[in-house]
A protein has these predicted regions:
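A flexible loop/linker signature enriched in serine peptidases of the S9 family
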Residues: 1, 7-19, 32-39, 52-64, ...
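Short coil/turn segments that connect the beta-strands within blades of beta-propeller domains
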Residues: 2-4, 47-49, 91-93, 151-152
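Alpha-helix C-terminal capping segments
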Residues: 21, 65-67, 148-149
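Surface-exposed loop/turn elements that mediate protein-protein interactions on large endomembrane-trafficking
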Residues: 21-28
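Secondary-structure-rich domain cores
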Residues: 26, 68-71, 130-131
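Conserved beta-strand position repeated across blades of beta-propeller domains
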Residues: 43-45, 87, 147-148
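Generic detector of contiguous secondary-structure segments
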Residues: 70-93, 151-153
Length: 168
């Protein structure tokens, strides 16, 4: 968030590396990400102390919060649904993301709750850590790549008209 340190995911020879590059000192600090097969997307928390990832582990994509100082992570979703494009809200206590989940509960029985063919937006409270998410959209179209604009508005991509548009 300060613009001084850039976080970069690098894939090299089958391994994943998280690089922090300081633009002022030109220093590069890297750590191997052993737990993940692939990191699909990531973004900083507003205070710059955490990263939120959409990452693949054992063939499923879930949301993880990485503590930069401690170099540890916390898995916040763990189910068969595709959880993509996570971003912290401007207060940093919630995460907005896209998912093909058919309900608003984390870790539900797959036999009764099959994944949808489209992506909706969901909000996850990182402090209360309840198993229930807040569903933001519920449409037959895809809503993806949500970015919180402020404490009320979220911009996202939607293919509602057959063409992908940015909606606020």
């Amino acid at each position: 968030p300060s613009g001084k340190v850039v976080a970069i995911i690098k894939e090299k020879k089958g391994k994943l590396w998280l690089n922090f590059y300081n633009t002022e000192t030109k220093e590069n600090n890297r750590s191997e990400l052993l737990y993940f097969t692939k990191v699909l997307d990531m973004s900083y928390s507003p205070d710059g102390t955490k990263l939120v990832f959409s990452a693949v582990q054992k063939g499923q994509s879930d949301i993880y919060v990485f503590n930069i100082r401690g170099r540890n992570y916390d898995q916040v979703t763990n189910d068969i649904y595709d959880d993509l494009y996570p971003h912290f809200t401007d207060a940093g206590n919630k995460i907005v993301f896209s998912s093909n989940r058919s309900n608003d509960t984390v870790g539900v029985d797959v036999k009764r709750n099959r994944p949808q063919n489209n992506f909706d937006l969901f909000l996850l409270d990182t402090y209360n850590r309840q198993q229930v998410l807040t569903r933001i959209t519920s449409t037959p179209e895809d809503e993806t790549q949500a970015i919180p604009m402020d404490s009320i508005h979220i911009a996202y991509l939607s293919d509602k008209n057959g063409v992908v548009n940015r909606i606020v």
